[in-house]
UniProtKB/Swiss-Prot annotation:
Domain Plastocyanin-like: 31-148, 159-322, 425-563
GO CC annotation, single: apoplast
Record EC number: 1.10.3.2
Annotated signal peptide: 1-23
Top class in the EC scheme: oxidoreductase
Binding-site residues, Cu cation 2: H84, H127, H544
Protein name stated in the entry: Laccase-24
Source species: Oryza sativa subsp. japonica (Rice)
Length: 579
């Protein structure tokens, strides 16, 4: 019997050895420095970029590979790189958020990021995690299946196309963020949106070289790897005379989801097969606009033109083989405030196969995600308070997060010396219960006013956490893209209004919920997520609107060590930057 089992297992053992043998070390060098660009009426704009590119270089790896990136900071600013969506199991020092897992790399310095991509495949991305520099310091991170394209659980595309959506300011984004901090006023909206770094045809001073072109061939299947790298804006994405078959989100496969519009919040990714309407694929020389517009989810806020640029960003999808004889077709876009379309897209996707959702929950959290106010701080040397003496702030459970300034939180955890760095008292619930989404709730000064702190929630290794994320109307109701470092989570349910702990659990999808690293909490609503804390370290959870993060919309999970060396924090690398 033992011999027959050995024979049966031999092919599997050989396959495992072959898989391990095929794993590679994928190595890149990122030179971060100044780049001069002429765009939108500006003869010369100096931005911070990687390897002189906007977007930066695409990292391509295969599942199981080790990725090594040598980052050389030739810019005038501090710098870190975050590998958005990478679990960093065993490599928490490579996660990248400044003052959370590392001190930033100073100008003239360098740091080598090393991490493994085992158990992950799909579209992720990388970006700066210091100040507003990720406005131009970003790029795609593609993880291919170990079995190649034939291993895709959907029709194999003939080609794959990276589409990175971004925002563009006609000013230095570092100065923009510093001005926002010292005055206490949120930064103004972007001057333009971009597709692969270019704004398109519809802006003033647009030039032909400022519109990205995708040259396609007839009767070929294309998969778009769509990334929202914008600082502060959810986007509607369409291609005229085409629809999409969504097959993955945040590098997790989904059941095929057919739609004519993709809705994507900052931090999120979507993989979609591009489906031409009848006759399009055969139209030699056919030209179609790819377009994005902002999704304005804010309710009871300022005029949308104050919050967002309302001009479409465009690229051109062109079918070759003949002359372009007509202007590109323009897609019909949703209204800016079309929350119904946004919610339909963001909530209807499900996992491709049933997930192993943990049923027993160890830690329950109910967390309000709020805009509010606070008093001017000593660092805000040009503070401009309102008539009540307060300035804009944001918070989770009324705690407005600030980063430490002496050492990183991960170093403090590793050394066991957290005093003066952070405290272990992030609350599981808000200080009071009230009608979170009612218009009258803005009179509730208890929760609207917040205080700055660096609080973490400590979790036992391998514990299961369920978090209800509840939007509030203290200032305005708005969809917030909440991103968790170090983990994926299951999105069990989403809805509008106040979460009801008695009736809403009946809506939980415990069979095939979508798996994400960034969830867009519905405007004036809630989302329930669940994850297993099996990755020791300190892991940032925050709104992926940088305009909200800088004013405190974040918190940190401290996951304790497990029982073995493999489930405990490793020592820091020798080249870890020092503060």
């Amino acid at each position: 019997m033992a011999r027959s089992w050995s024979l049966l297992l031999l092919p599997f053992a050989l396959a495992l050895v072959a898989s391990v043998a095929q794993a590679a070390v994928v190595e890149y060098t990122f030179n971060v420095g100044n780049l001069s660009i002429s765009q939108l009426c500006q003869q010369e704009m100096i931005i911070t970029a990687v390897n002189g590119q906007l977007p930066g270089p695409t990292i391509v790896a295969t599942e199981g590979d080790t990725v090594v990136v040598h980052m050389v900071n030739e810019s005038p600013y501090n710098m870190t790189i975050h590998w958005h969506g990478i679990f960093q199991r065993g490599t928490p020092w490579a996660d990248g958020p400044a003052m959370v897992t590392q001190c930033p790399v100073r100008p003239g310095g360098n740091y080598t990021y090393r991490f493994n991509v085992t158990g992950q495949e799909g579209t992720l991305w990388w970006h700066s995690h210091f100040s507003f520099l990720r406005a131009t310091v970003y790029g795609a991170l593609i993880i291919k299946p170990r079995g190649g394209a034939k291993a895709y659980p959907f029709p194999v595309p003939d080609e794959e196309v990276v589409v990175i959506l971004g925002e563009w300011w006609k000013t230095n984004v570092y100065d923009l963020q510093q001005r926002s901090l010292v005055t206490g006023n949120p930064a103004p909206h972007a001057d333009a949106y971009t597709i692969n770094g270019k704004p398109g045809d519809f802006y003033n001073c647009s030039a032909p070289n400022q519109t990205h072109k995708f040259e396609l061939k007839q009767n070929k299947t294309y998969m778009l790897r769509i990334i929202n790298a914008a600082l502060n804006t959810p986007l509607f994405f369409k291609v005229a005379n085409h629809s999409f078959n969504v097959v993955a989100a945040d590098a997790c496969y989904t059941k095929p989801y057919k739609t004519d519009v993709v809705v994507i919040s900052p931090g999120q990714t979507v993989d979609a097969l591009l489906v031409p309407d009848a006759g399009v694929a055969a139209a030699v020389g056919g030209r179609y606009y790819m377009a994005v517009i902002p999704y304005n989810s804010a309710v009871n806020a300022a005029d949308p033109s104050f919050l967002y640029s309302l001009t479409n960003s465009t690229a051109i999808v062109e079918y070759g083989g003949g002359p372009a004889t007509s202007p590109p077709m323009v897609p019909d876009m949703p209204e800016y405030n079309d929350t119904a379309t946004a919610h339909r897209f963001l909530s209807n996707m499900t996992a491709l196969v049933p997930n192993r959702v943990p049923l027993a929950v160890d830690t329950h959290m109910f967390v309000t995600v709020s805009m509010g106010d606070t008093f001017c701080g000593p660092e805000q040397t040009m503070c401009m308070p309102d008539d009540k003496g307060t300035i804009f702030a944001s918070s989770m459970n009324n705690a407005s997060f600030i980063l430490p300034n002496t050492t990183s939180m991960l170093e403090a955890m590793y050394k066991g010396s957290i005093d003066g760095v952070y405290t272990r008292d992030f609350p599981d619930t808000p200080p009071i219960v009230f009608d979170y989404t009612a218009d009258a709730s803005d009179d509730n000064a208890t929760l609207k006013h917040t205080f700055k702190s660096t609080k973490v929630k400590t979790l036992k290794y391998n514990s299961t956490v369920q978090m209800v994320l509840q939007n509030t109307r203290l200032v305005s109701k708005e969809s917030h893209p909440m991103h968790l470092h170090g983990f994926n989570f299951f999105v069990l349910a989403q809805g509008f209004g106040n979460y009801n702990e008695t009736t809403d659990p009946a809506k939980f999808n415990l069979v095939d919920p979508q798996e994400r690293n960034t969830v867009a909490v519905p405007t004036g609503g809630w989302a329930v997520i669940r994850f297993v804390a099996d990755n020791p370290g300190v892991w940032f959870m925050h709104c992926h609107f940088d305009a909200h993060l800088e004013f405190g919309l974040g918190m940190v999970f401290e996951v304790q060590n497990g029982p073995t060396q493999e489930t405990s924090l490793p020592p820091p690398p020798s080249d870890l930057p020092q503060c």
